[in-house]
Amino acid sequence: HTDAEEVTLEVNPVKVIMRVDTLYLVAGEMDEKGNQAFKNYVFERIDSVTETNHAMPKFVFDAKLHYKYCFGKYSGQGTPEDVSLEIKSSSKWLQSQFERSHFYPEISKRFDKNKNMIVDMKLHVTPDFLNWLMGNAGEVRILKPASLKESVKKLLKKALAEMDA
């Protein structure tokens, strides 16, 4: 964002990862309990890099674990949620996307009597996932959790109100 405030951070670079067509610098830090935590920094937002003499802890980074329960670009924070979606039978293209996509951990897919695909997954509810649900609201019905359904309804109402403003 060009209008964002400029911030200088000291980070511990661990790995460079390309995810969903975006290049990230993954940096490690120690949380208040002494556990290793990792954050993603988008390369295109990094203006400059300066090397320091500061000692860096040895970080053990596992990309598969870092992106566990994730949908899209963002690595999740907090506890992942159990999510169930119904992909309408009329939306074969979207059903095929779930057939070909790779999730970690694996998602469960089954069909109901009306040939709607029921997808059960455990993931972090991220901005990518919320935007995806909004963009596919006509093809996807949120079965659970109810809190996710309410969040998406509020976002859709807000978007409609903005269009009329």
How would you label these PLM feature ranges?
Residues 68-165:
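Polybasic (Lys/Arg-rich)
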